[in-house]
């Protein structure tokens, strides 16, 4: 089965990594709109247009399924993209919510949603969580993480300063943290380490990783099995510098 993965840049590598590990598909076409990253600071109309333009990119590749591996596009462009597509299109928000439903029974558990400004303002996660009965929800726009990750700054003083800026003012400490941007799993260990090192948490917070969640979602929805193929063929495309994107993929995904 040949599928597409669409992201604003390199954040979708976190989803791609989970897909490659599961070996569900024979061929994956990855498209990063790196010339226009970040999406999270742009208005909803622009993001919808970017999503429709991504559909145009994938048409000649004849994919059978498209994964929108970008939370901002999933929140604001997914429905519009689905209207104009003849193939199934899956976003990352619904799988993440279902992952929480499976793992978190306490409807009053404090849940913190991290995301870009556009994702947080869309209330997509808040609304989806409330539909499942979760009541104790807080959210935080952590858009500065995106350019740091795009520049491969995954540790060090600059990232620590950024986490301190965002997390120090928190009044309610989370039991669950939704990594509501596919860039964020790339610094998941640093986020967990910050909370354990700076707050008196009895146990590490549960981190919801959209890449792992979407693999579980696809397995259930389409009856897919792990190791269905030996190793998927991956082809990279970008609206910006594709050589840079491929170099980042080799570094992060060990291709």
Swiss-Prot record:
One of its GO terms (biological process) is cell wall organization. Keywords: Cell shape, Cell wall biogenesis/degradation, Isomerase, Peptidoglycan synthesis. One of its GO terms (molecular function) is glutamate racemase activity. It is an enzyme of class 5 (isomerase). Substrate binds at residues 7-8, 39-40, 71-72, 182-183. SUPFAM superfamilies: Aspartate/glutamate racemase. Pfam families: Asp_Glu_race. It catalyses: L-glutamate = D-glutamate. The active site is at 70 (proton donor/acceptor), 181 (proton donor/acceptor). Coiled coil: none annotated. Disulfide bonds: none annotated. Pathway: Cell wall biogenesis; peptidoglycan biosynthesis. It comes from the Bacteria. Its EC number is 5.1.1.3. HAMAP family: Glu_racemase. Provides the (R)-glutamate required for cell wall biosynthesis. Belongs to the aspartate/glutamate racemases family. Homodimer. This is Glutamate racemase. It comes from Helicobacter pylori (strain J99 / ATCC 700824). The gene is murI.
């Amino acid at each position: 089965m040949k599928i597409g993965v669409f992201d604003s840049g390199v954040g979708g590598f976190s989803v791609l990594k989970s897909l490659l590990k599961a070996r569900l598909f024979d061929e994956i076409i990855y498209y990063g709109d790196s010339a226009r990253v970040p999406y999270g600071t742009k208005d909803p109309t622009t993001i919808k247009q970017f999503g429709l333009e991504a559909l145009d990119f994938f048409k000649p590749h004849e994919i059978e399924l498209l994964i929108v591996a970008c939370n901002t596009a999933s929140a604001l462009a997914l429905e519009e993209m689905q209207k104009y597509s003849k193939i199934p299109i899956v976003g990352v928000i619904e799988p993440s919510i279902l992952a929480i439903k499976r793992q978190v029974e306490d409807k009053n558990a404090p849940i913190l949603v991290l995301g870009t400004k556009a994702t947080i303002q869309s209330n997509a996660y808040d609304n989806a969580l409330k539909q499942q009965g979760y009541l104790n929800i807080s959210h935080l726009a952590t858009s500065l993480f995106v350019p740091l990750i795009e520049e491969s700054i995954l540790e060090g003083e600059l990232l620590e300063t950024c986490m301190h800026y965002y997390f120090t003012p928190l009044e309610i400490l989370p039991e669950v943290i939704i990594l509501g941007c596919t860039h964020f799993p790339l610094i998941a260990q640093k986020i967990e380490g910050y909370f354990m090192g700076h707050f008196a948490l009895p146990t590490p917070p549960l981190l919801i990783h959209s890449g792992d969640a979407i693999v579980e979602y696809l397995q259930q929805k389409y009856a897919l099995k792990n190791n269905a193929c030996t190793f998927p063929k991956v082809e990279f495309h970008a609206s910006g510098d594709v050589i840079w994107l491929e170099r980042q993929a080799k570094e992060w995904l060990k291709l």
